[in-house]
């Protein structure tokens, strides 16, 4: 799966089956979505979303001050864009605070 871009957000969505649950992985400070790449193959019976937080990896730099609210809004924009209604959220370090 190659990286996709939406309004400056960089993400990968491994959609396998509409009946599968979706897991969203959020990386920690100073990292990017690649830290979760090895997890994707472990969840063969799930759809998986990994993405770069604003100011990280290939996502754009934030226009204003960085905050947890800004990161939460970014997640909402991505899940609304790809029409995910329910998901399991897994975060590491900063990603666990969103």
Q: What are the roles of these predicted feature ranges?
A:
Residues 1-23, 44-47, 80, 84-86:
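Alpha/beta-hydrolase fold catalytic core
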Residues 4, 33, 39, 74-77:
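Residue-identity detector for glutamine
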Residues 15-60:
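Conserved HGGG/HGGXW glycine-rich cap/lid loop of the alpha/beta-hydrolase fold
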Residues 49-90:
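Active-site loop/oxyanion-hole signature of alpha/beta-hydrolase fold enzymes
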Residues 91-95:
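Gly/Ala-rich beta-loop-alpha elbow adjacent to hydrolase catalytic centers
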């Amino acid at each position: 799966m190659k990286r996709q871009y939406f309004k400056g957000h960089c993400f990968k969505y491994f959609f396998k089956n509409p009946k599968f649950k979706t897991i969203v992985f959020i990386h920690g400070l100073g990292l990017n979505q690649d830290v979760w790449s090895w997890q994707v193959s472990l969840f063969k019976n799930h759809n998986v979303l990994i993405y770069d937080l604003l100011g990280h990896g290939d996502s754009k730099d934030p226009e204003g001050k960085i905050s947890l609210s800004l990161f939460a809004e970014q997640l909402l924009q991505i899940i609304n864009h790809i029409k995910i209604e329910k998901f399991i959220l897994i975060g590491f370090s900063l990603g666990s605070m969103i």
